[in-house]
Amino acid sequence: MTKPIILTGDRPTGKLHLGHYVGSLKNRVFLQNENKYKMFVFLADQQALTDHAKESELIQESIGNVALDYLSVGLDPKQSTIFIQSQIPELAELSMYYMNLVSLARLERNPTVKTEIAQKGFGESIPSGFLVYPVSQAADITAFKANLVPVGNDQKPMIEQTREIVRSFNHTYHTDCLVEPEGIYPENEKAGRLPGLDGNAKMSKSLGNGIYLSDDADTVRKKVMSMYTDPNHIKIEDPGQIEGNMVFHYLDIFARKEDQADIEAMKEHYQRGGLGDVKTKRYLLDILERELAPIRERRLEYAKDMGEVFRMLQEGSQKARTVAAKTLSEVKSAMGINYF
């Protein structure tokens, strides 16, 4: 029986943080280890260039860092094909063919793109590559005939646009060579969008309000101890608010089942007064370190031989290119432009 295919990835614009870990990485490792799927995981450097065109050095540096993060959380190149987007030229060619099937108006209506354009403050200077990156994503997904794509809820419009492109292509060229993907969305809304340590709506590399998978134990401790709690909880005996308190928000996400009773008791104690923020932060720190310590240890080990890390990426890219080339050939045959 053929295994369903999963495609997932990240933009290499910096090291990955806890938001990436609970939002996608942890689930990827789970899906990989279930051994029910054929996994493709990629570093979307071409997509990163759509809004970092003048920061190619950052992207180059981030390739190695993100690869280390992948390996340290448990992604295994023997079980998952890990590759670099720019090393698969077939993806760019597929994008060109798909762009002929999507109107500019449709691209401009994509809610995800509209939101990101506003957030990035492009104004009238929107890079054309950024505007069409949903088409590039469709090429990434369809090149590997992915059945399933794990994404955040904010990416639903991107999946739908890919499905539209697939239907349009298959209808236009009377073929079924492209596969309509389904999105896999987070069940835990809190985990799907982890807030920053400062209470900002999202943990973000650009805002510097996150805990990175590469942070050492002392850095993690300092960041946890500076987390946003209840600004009105000045004295230990004061009643405290749980809502909007990042320490309790993180506890809800990272705690295991066996921790739940203790956390509920802490919440009640905090709300009636008599429990200080330092104690709750230390409790959270222990829980985070339980998760981060083995990741940190593996990362340090892999970092000793970056040559081997890049050999892994090269081998994965070669494997991925073979698959993408086969799909491209099928696409060109359907279009009637496979001349030789």
UniProtKB/Swiss-Prot annotation:
Record-stated family: Belongs to the class-I aminoacyl-tRNA synthetase family.
Reactions the enzyme catalyzes: tRNA(Trp) + L-tryptophan + ATP = L-tryptophyl-tRNA(Trp) + AMP + diphosphate + H(+)
Classification lineage: Bacteria, Bacillati, Bacillota, Bacilli, Lactobacillales
Alphabetical keyword list: Aminoacyl-tRNA synthetase, ATP-binding, Cytoplasm, Ligase, Nucleotide-binding, Protein biosynthesis
Enzyme Commission code(s) on record: 6.1.1.2
Gene Ontology MF, one: ATP binding
Originating organism: Streptococcus pyogenes serotype M3 (strain ATCC BAA-595 / MGAS315)
Top-rank lineage group of the source organism: Bacteria
Assembly and oligomerization: Homodimer.
Compartments reported by the entry: Cytoplasm
Short sequence motif 'HIGH' region: positions: 12-20
Binding residue positions for L-tryptophan: D140
TM annotation in the entry: none
Pfam family, one: tRNA-synt_1b
GO biological process: tryptophanyl-tRNA aminoacylation
Annotated positions binding ATP: R11, P12, T13, G19, H20, G152, N153, D154, L194, K202, M203, S204, K205, S206
Motif 'KMSKS' region in this chain: 202-206
Protein name per UniProt: Tryptophan--tRNA ligase
Chief site of localization: cytoplasm
InterPro entries referenced in this protein's UniProt entry, alphabetically: aa-tRNA-synth_I_CS (IPR001412), aa-tRNA-synth_Ic (IPR002305), Rossmann-like_a/b/a_fold (IPR014729), Trp-tRNA-ligase (IPR002306), Trp-tRNA-ligase_bac-type (IPR024109), Trp-tRNA_synthetase (IPR050203)
Gene transcribed to yield this protein: trpS
Keyword Transmembrane: no
Keyword Zinc among record annotations: no
A Gene Ontology cellular-component term: cytosol
Function (record text): Catalyzes the attachment of tryptophan to tRNA(Trp).
CDD domains xref list: TrpRS_core
